[in-house]
Amino acid sequence: GSGIGHPGSYYGEWGYGHIKGQKIRAVPDLEKYHGTDTFLSEALTIEANREITKAVEEKRPFYLNMAHYAVHSPFQADKRFLSRYTDPDKNEQARAFATLIEGMDKSLGDIMDQLEKLEIAENTLILFLGDNGGDAPLGDERGYGSSAPLRGKKGTEFEGGMRVPFIAAWAKPEKKSKVQKNLPIEVGSMQTQLGTIMDIYPTVLSVAGCEVPQNYVIDGFDLKKQLSGKVDKKRPESFLMHFPHAHRGSYFTTYRMGDWKLIYYYLPETPKQPKALLYNLKDDPEERNELSSAHPDKCREMIQEMSAQLEKEGALYPVDKQGNELKPFVYF
């Protein structure tokens, strides 16, 4: 990726950011496309298919990590699709965002077509996911935008800021395939058990039949059982997200335990803002009904458990003006 993680530009005419004032964001390599009208998503797809073809010709397995940059800002229109998005009620950035989505969709389709052409689709597992919550130029940061009905955007404490799409599928489903029998994925099935991006590494190792290097610490869980439609009873039904610094949703920790979710604020933005919010995600995935007053015992339990988890991980905390750590506490 670029030095700052997102492109200076999606346009080949602009060298994907190799222009004055954008060098830190410039996409490396791809010089052959500089000065052309090749959109970044298309250039990456061409190169990805080239590498896949090379691996097949050399008769070696491959792992492709295809990071499109899309749909990250800057929201620049992919002109191949712009004529389809003319709604005058949507702003220019929203229309550009729609073209980025379609360009990413076409990219995935082109790669799948290449797998089919090379006759390796039955043996190729595709994992499609986001790396953070939605950030489309729609709605406000703590409201409802492209992640609707989930609330919030990237970097916020709400579900729209941390949940991401995750799709696992064989490029060409075939029940008779020996490879797919090792990991049967039912077409159209849905898994509701918790999973995280940290699970990708151990899952890929498992599917590929590779052993974890000795003394190597693995943070995630193998998803094979969950991808097969089963429940992994060994997996804890908890998730801790610690955000002790300034950004959009500043100085908070969220802790999920089963269906319950706690949001704890170290530095509330206003005197009236509560330090803790409690939601039941099973009944209220949109986080509209705050329950800390209705369930004070559950709120206290969650704060205590969250604090224990933070201490176990050696977490850092925000500090006040005197330099004192602002550790969470049960305050009601």
Predicted regions and their residues:
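Formylglycine-dependent
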Residues: 1-62, 68-77, 95-98, 179-181
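Loop/turn elements at helix/coil->beta-strand transitions in domains of secreted/extracellular proteins
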Residues: 57-64, 120-126, 162-164, 235-236, ...
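C-terminal cap/loop subdomain of S1 sulfatases and analogous C-terminal strand-loop tails that border
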Residues: 134-157, 169, 173-193, 198-281, ...
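Metal-dependent active-site segment of extracytoplasmic phospho-/sulfohydrolases and closely related
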Residues: 61, 67-68, 103-142
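Short, solvent-exposed loop/turn and secondary-structure capping segments
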Residues: 6-10, 74-81, 137-146, 178-180, ...
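Short, solvent-exposed turn/loop segments enriched in Gly/Ser/Thr/Pro and often Arg
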Residues: 2-3, 65-76, 128-136, 219-220, ...
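Beta-strand elements within well-structured catalytic alpha/beta cores of enzymes
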Residues: 62-67, 101, 108, 125-130, ...
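Long, internal low-complexity/basic segments
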Residues: 200, 257, 267-275, 281-332
